[in-house]
Design a protein with these regions (language model features):
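Conserved short submotifs of the Hanks-type protein kinase catalytic core
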Residues: 92-106, 110
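Activation segment signature within eukaryotic-like protein kinase domains
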Residues: 125-126
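Activation-segment/catalytic-loop signature of the eukaryotic protein kinase fold
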Residues: 88
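Protein kinase glycine-rich loop
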Residues: 24-31, 36
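AlphaC helix of the eukaryotic protein kinase fold
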Residues: 54-76
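Protein kinase catalytic-loop region centered on the HRD/HxD motif
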Residues: 129-141
Length: 224
């Protein structure tokens, strides 16, 4: 029996009907702030991705507010290169998001599988990401955590930017002013490391680091 199967059998959310609508079927992935499940939207009869915040973060009012803002921020972006957010709510005291389910992989997994990309391949994913970011920036949303794990690669169509959980709306008051730095060190602009403040240029910097990694197989420098 695989670890994934064991996890599914012991996870209390598996089989649960969330919000009287979303039937959780299995775990898809686990990240730093949430676990993503595959669920069936029984109202619209379609599979969706259900992102549930980790229990140890549920008591943090700041994090809960940030998590809820993810849905509002991402919902303002309508673009084929951005993972759509459909719904949000709370289950067993944990915030959740209902998102578009992408059939495919991500850039991190592709890099691990094949190493450095060809120039056309790297430019394609870079262009897809830039187009999605342009749509987000037009509505005042920055991502703050652009990295290969957050670039999904469907079996067809353009790459899609995922996980706006660390996003901040430029037009809204930003909690980054408190000095809490959000992001992955290898990909963040030096200005963020120094001030914890970001703007659209920060996303472009991160995309440039990804392009370097796709062409060479490594980031310019390790996390420090």
């Amino acid at each position: 029996m695989s670890d994934e199967q064991t996890f599914d059998q012991t996870d209390p959310l598996i089989g649960l009907l969330v919000d009287e609508r979303y039937r959780v079927t299995r775990r898809l992935a686990r990240g730093g702030m949430a676990t993503v499940y595959i669920a069936q939207d029984e109202r619209l009869d379609r599979p969706v991705a259900l992102k549930v915040m980790h229990p140890h973060l549920a008591d943090s009012a700041d994090f809960v507010a940030r998590f809820r803002r993810e849905a509002r921020s991402a919902a303002r972006i309508v673009h084929p290169g951005v993972v759509s957010v459909f719904d949000q709510g709370v289950v067993t005291g944990q915030g959740f998001l209902v998102m578009e389910l992408i059939d495919g992989t991500n850039l991190r997994q592709l890099l691990r599988a094949q190493g450095a990309f060809t120039i056309p391949q790297a430019l394609r994913y870079t262009t897809d990401t830039l187009e999605a970011l342009r749509a987000a920036h037009r509505v005042g949303v920055i991502h703050r955590d652009i990295k290969p794990e957050n670039i999904l690669v469907p079996t067809d169509g353009p790459a899609k930017v995922a996980d706006f959980g660390l996003a901040r709306a430029v037009s809204e008051g930003s909690t980054s002013a408190t000095g809490n730095m959000l992001g992955t060190v290898a990909y963040i602009a030096p200005e963020i490391a120094q001030t914890a403040k970001a703007d659209a240029r920060s996303d472009l910097y991160s995309d440039g680091i990804m392009l370097y990694e796709m062409l060479t197989g490594a980031v310019p420098w390790a996390d420090e």
